[in-house]
């Protein structure tokens, strides 16, 4: 009550911020008459003037009013577009490192030019992050005209571009690219073998377009550079033949072999299912039924493959979660409906889906480097973003990224009419109503955008509309190449466009069609008369569509997130245009089936509702919103959980990457090597000749053997001690240290100082990279099984932190020892050999990168089952308990004398 009273008196925080920013808008507007009088040359001369003032120590905030006024005037002269006052506010919000929520059609691309221009004046680079390559290239080309006119350089990065071009793009004042490409290049830079091989020059300031899509929807997807591992795909194919014979349970305790946890995207075998699976695997020749069971230690790999195959068959659906194109399984993004070419699910899931679909099974991947988008973007010194829908996720933006959301008012009031949801008993009734609505709109010339959540639904609707004779276009992952054309025509009279989630499409639907696209089609030689004729024709269509009610939005299903629904709605009613929207739901929709309360379904059935009966009720709408809030909270927990774990990895990643940077930047690493060598020798000697110990505790022969095997040094310590009985442990350590130093000095004298320095640097980088790669695999294994610690009344996250630290400490010690051992034993005769080594290593890295992929790590519920932990225990060499008595087989008689099999008696799995 007090809060609401204070808000009424002083306004909300958002209103107070807007009032402060409006004062600066007044200053910018006051400068406009003066700036307008400047000639082109005088206006362009402002850029070097601003740069000098900033270099002399003037703060960006002081330069802001004048810089924004200059950018606004340049936009008017070069692009023919003048920034509105609300766009100036949006630009200031972005400059302050916040998120600007701006409705669709409010000109976010133009807004970004203001803070981009201002921050690029520092000369440290500005990254503009988009959701796809098309938008990156389009925005770089369109807005690049403005920046180039103002004297700033613009680059764009995209997959597969030549190295020199990419390096030049990153050296530009402003760089456009996708979140994937910026993240991928960051990881690649940290696999580079020399400074010259790196692309980026630091993460200074980023503006993220569609910030909710990138920082929230994709936050569950770690960005992974992975290369093929050495496993065989044959087992996936053999297990795939077995899985269709297993039967799904309709209820968790019903009959069948397995049940599906749809929330967590996991599959669990029942007791009967384990027996049935074991029997089928024996019949298929995968298991030896006489001597081993499914859960015998040597068969844990089979368990892993079986779980992956079950998930592939029971959870992942073709044309919903993925499509098959050109003999490959391509993931479909659940949020945007786009295909994610090059991305693969991890943990063998992608291979299992390939086996299911009968396409060539590619080898499993090994992680070479990884980072989450959360930790990537938190590394920028300043981060901001813009989107049409951020306010529903304001808490997450603030708690994870420290980003405040500021809602920017629209330039013109929104007059779109949002109708209440209509709820049907089943999908058939729902789609009948959807088709009737579409046909009615088409008859009166009103364009319709139909939003679906899967390719399957979009194609089913397309078939029905084709039968009814309604002309339409389908925009989904399969029509990705025609996207721009389809969207450009979606606002024409009676146009019907069926689209999978429109989130992040980045192109406005203009009533009457895209005038800009039509004029572009005329070509550069078009006369003014031709352009005028096209414009007049477009104006007629524009007026006709407005009269018909503007763009009508039909939602065929509620998405898990309210934000995605709002994005679909936001495609209509842009810049004060008329429009309308309605969502059609059924009790068979995933959201309603999994998350909505059972009483809603019971009540509708008790009321005797039939297929085509519809219910419009606030109570039901509230239940739907409640269900969406549940899912949003569930997904937030998953993302927060992922971040908690990745923060541990991130601390380690920072240490390793800082060491790599130090190595790449250093002219010589001799001091590092000398320090490492002293530490390693001290530890080795202390193991065999402990400090302050007596000679009875010494193992001189063991020390001699280690020195010979690790360093190629022959040193008779037993003879030395016989000759000099007064030698104590410290003296022996000094003698060994002296001999090792002498050995290194002799090696350096033989090859020359310059060659030795190059070799030291090469060996340190190679060992560090290989050890880090192996460490990432160990961290994956640790994380997958860590949740089982909860059963032992231990806190999994704390256990993970503790063991991750121990693994990291061990890795650093191993790096030291490996470096010294390699440098001791390597035989190099010339500098050319070192260069040849580096060239070969560089080729290997490039080969790995050419085969590497964005691995779309599936982190459904981010938990692990017991079998996974057992797999990791076996792989990490954890000691197995030794039995005093023979092991009882699951099919053997129970020792209790009941006459039952052990698995049905005291060996029954709980």
Curated annotation (Swiss-Prot):
Function of the protein: Part of the Sec protein translocase complex. Interacts with the SecYEG preprotein conducting channel. Has a central role in coupling the hydrolysis of ATP to the transfer of proteins into and across the cell membrane, serving both as a receptor for the preprotein-SecB complex and as an ATP-driven molecular motor driving the stepwise translocation of polypeptide chains across the membrane.
Subcellular location: Cell inner membrane; Cytoplasm
Domain of life of the native organism: Bacteria
Basic residues bias (residue ranges): 900-910
InterPro entries reported for this sequence: Helicase_ATP-bd (IPR014001), Helicase_C-like (IPR001650), P-loop_NTPase (IPR027417), SEC_C_motif (IPR004027), SecA (IPR000185), SecA_CS (IPR020937), SecA_DEAD (IPR011115), SecA_motor_DEAD (IPR014018)
Catalytic activities: ATP + H2O + cellular proteinSide 1 = ADP + phosphate + cellular proteinSide 2
Main location: membrane
UniProt gene name: secA
Example GO biological process: intracellular protein transmembrane transport
Cofactor binding notes: May bind 1 zinc ion per subunit.
Residues binding ATP, per UniProt: 87, 105-109, 508
Renumbered residue ranges of the record's region Disordered: 558-580, 873-910
Keyword Cell membrane: yes
GO molecular function: ATP binding; metal ion binding; protein-exporting ATPase activity
Entry-linked HAMAP family: SecA
Topology versus the membrane: Peripheral membrane protein
Binding site for Zn(2+): 894, 896, 905-906
Keyword terms, alphabetized: ATP-binding, Cell inner membrane, Cell membrane, Cytoplasm, Membrane, Metal-binding, Nucleotide-binding, Protein transport, Translocase, Translocation, Transport, Zinc
Species annotation: Stenotrophomonas maltophilia (strain R551-3)
Gene3D superfamilies linked: Helical scaffold and wing domains of SecA, P-loop containing nucleotide triphosphate hydrolases, SecA, preprotein cross-linking domain
E.C. numbers: 7.4.2.8
Similarity remark: Belongs to the SecA family.
Protein name (database record): Protein translocase subunit SecA
Subunit structure: Monomer and homodimer. Part of the essential Sec protein translocation apparatus which comprises SecA, SecYEG and auxiliary proteins SecDF-YajC and YidC.
Cellular component annotations (GO), alphabetically ordered: cell envelope Sec protein transport complex; cytosol; plasma membrane
Pfam families linked to this entry: P-loop_SecA, SEC-C, SecA_DEAD, SecA_PP_bind, SecA_SW
NCBIfam families in the cross-refs: PRK12904.1, secA
Cofactor: Zn(2+)
């Amino acid at each position: 009550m007090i809060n609401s009273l204070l808000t009424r008196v002083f306004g909300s925080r958002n209103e107070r911020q807007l009032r402060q920013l409006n004062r600066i808008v007044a200053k910018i507007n006051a400068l406009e008459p003066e700036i307008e009088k400047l000639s082109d040359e005088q206006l362009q001369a402002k850029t070097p003037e601003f740069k000098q003032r900033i270099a002399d120590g003037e703060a960006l905030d002081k330069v802001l009013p004048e810089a924004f006024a200059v950018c606004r005037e340049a936009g008017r002269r070069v692009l023919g577009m003048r920034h509105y006052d609300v766009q100036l506010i949006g630009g200031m919000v972005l400059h302050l490192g916040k998120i600007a929520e701006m409705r669709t059609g409010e000109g976010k691309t133009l807004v970004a030019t203001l803070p981009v221009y201002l921050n690029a004046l520092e000369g440290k680079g500005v990254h503009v992050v988009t959701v796809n390559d098309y938008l990156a290239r389009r925005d770089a080309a369109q807005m690049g005209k403005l920046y180039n006119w103002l004297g700033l350089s613009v680059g764009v990065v995209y997959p597969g571009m030549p190295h020199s071009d990419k390096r030049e793009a990153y050296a530009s004042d402003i760089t456009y690219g996708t979140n994937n490409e910026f993240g991928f290049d960051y990881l690649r830079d940290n696999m580079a073998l020399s400074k010259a091989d790196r692309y980026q020059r630091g993460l200074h300031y980023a503006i993220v377009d569609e910030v909710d899509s990138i920082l929230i929807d994709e936050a569950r997807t770690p960005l992974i550079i992975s290369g093929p591992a050495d496993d065989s795909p044959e087992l996936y194919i053999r297990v795939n033949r077995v899985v269709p014979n297993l039967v799904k349970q309709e209820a968790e305790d019903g009959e069948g072999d397995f049940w599906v946890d749809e929330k967590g995207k996991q599959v669990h075998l029942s007791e009967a299912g384990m027996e049935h699976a074991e029997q089928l695997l024996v019949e298929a020749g995968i298991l030896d039924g006489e001597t081993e069971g499914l859960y015998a230690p040597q068969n844990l790999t089979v368990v892993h493959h079986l779980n992956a195959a079950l998930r592939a068959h029971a959870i992942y659906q073709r044309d919903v979660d993925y499509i098959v194109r050109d003999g490959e399984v391509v993931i479909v993004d659940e949020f945007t409906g786009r295909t994610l070419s090059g991305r693969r699910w991890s943990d063998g899931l992608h291979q299992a889906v390939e086996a299911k679909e009968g396409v060539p099974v590619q080898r499993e991947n090994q992680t070479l480097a990884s980072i989450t988008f959360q930790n990537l973007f938190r590394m920028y010194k300043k981060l901001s973003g813009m989107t049409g829908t951020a306010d529903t996720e304001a808490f997450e933006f603030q708690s994870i990224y420290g980003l405040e959301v500021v809602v920017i008012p629209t330039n013109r009031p929104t007059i779109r009419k949002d109708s209440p949801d209509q709820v049907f008993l089943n999908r058939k009734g729902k789609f009948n109503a959807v088709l009737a609505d579409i046909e009615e709109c088409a008859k009166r010339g009103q364009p319709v955008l139909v939003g679906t959540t899967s390719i399957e639904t979009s194609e089913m609707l397309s078939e029905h509309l084709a039968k009814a004779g309604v002309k339409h276009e389908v925009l989904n992952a399969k029509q990705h190449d025609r996207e721009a054309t389809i969207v450009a025509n979606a606002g024409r009279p009676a146009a019907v466009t069926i689209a999978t989630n429109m989130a992040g499409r980045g192109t406005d639907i203009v009533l009457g069609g895209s005038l800009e696209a039509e004029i572009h089609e005329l070509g550069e030689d078009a006369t003014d008369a031709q352009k005028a004729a096209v414009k007049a024709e477009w104006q007629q269509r524009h007026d006709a569509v407005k009269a018909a009610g503007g763009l009508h939005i039909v939602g065929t299903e509620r998405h898990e997130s309210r934000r995605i629904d709002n994005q679909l709605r936001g495609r209509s009613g842009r810049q004060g245009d008329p429009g309308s929207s309605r969502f059609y739901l059924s009790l068979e929709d995933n959201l309603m089936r999994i998350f909505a309360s059972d009483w809603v379904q019971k009540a509708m059935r008790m009321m005797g509702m039939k297929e085509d009966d519809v219910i419009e009720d606030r109570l039901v709408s509230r239940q739907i919103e409640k269900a969406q809030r549940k899912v949003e909270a569930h997904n937030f927990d998953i993302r927060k959980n992922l971040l908690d774990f990745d923060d541990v990895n991130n601390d380690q990643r920072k240490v390793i990457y800082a060491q790599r940077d130090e190595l790449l930047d250093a002219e010589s690493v001799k001091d590092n090597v000398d320090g490492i060598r002293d530490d390693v020798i001290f530890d080795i000697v202390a193991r065999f000749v402990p400090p302050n110990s007596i000679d009875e505790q010494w193992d001189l022969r063991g020390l001699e053997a280690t020195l010979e095997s690790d360093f190629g040094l022959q040193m008779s310590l037993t003879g030395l001690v016989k000759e000099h009985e007064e030698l104590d442990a410290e003296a022996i350590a000094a003698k060994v240290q002296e001999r090792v130093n002498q050995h290194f000095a002799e090696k350096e004298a033989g090859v020359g100082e310059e060659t030795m320095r190059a070799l030291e640097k090469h060996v340190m980088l190679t060992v560090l990279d290989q050890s880090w790669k192996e460490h990432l695999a160990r961290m994956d294994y640790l994380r997958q099984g860590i949740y089982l610690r909860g059963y032992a009344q231990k806190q999994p996250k704390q256990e993970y932190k503790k063991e991750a630290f121990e693994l990291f400490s061990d890795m650093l010690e191993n790096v030291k020892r490996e470096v010294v051992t390699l440098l001791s034993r390597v035989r190099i005769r010339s500098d050319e050999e070192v260069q040849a080594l580096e060239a070969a290593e560089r080729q290997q890295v490039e080969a790995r990168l050419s085969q590497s992929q964005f691995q779309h790590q599936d982190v459904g519920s981010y938990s692990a089952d017991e079998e996974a932990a057992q797999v990791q225990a076996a792989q990490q060499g954890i000691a197995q308990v030794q039995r005093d008595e023979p092991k009882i087989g699951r099919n053997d008689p129970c020792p209790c004398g009941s006459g039952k099999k052990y698995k049905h008696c005291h060996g029954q799995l709980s």
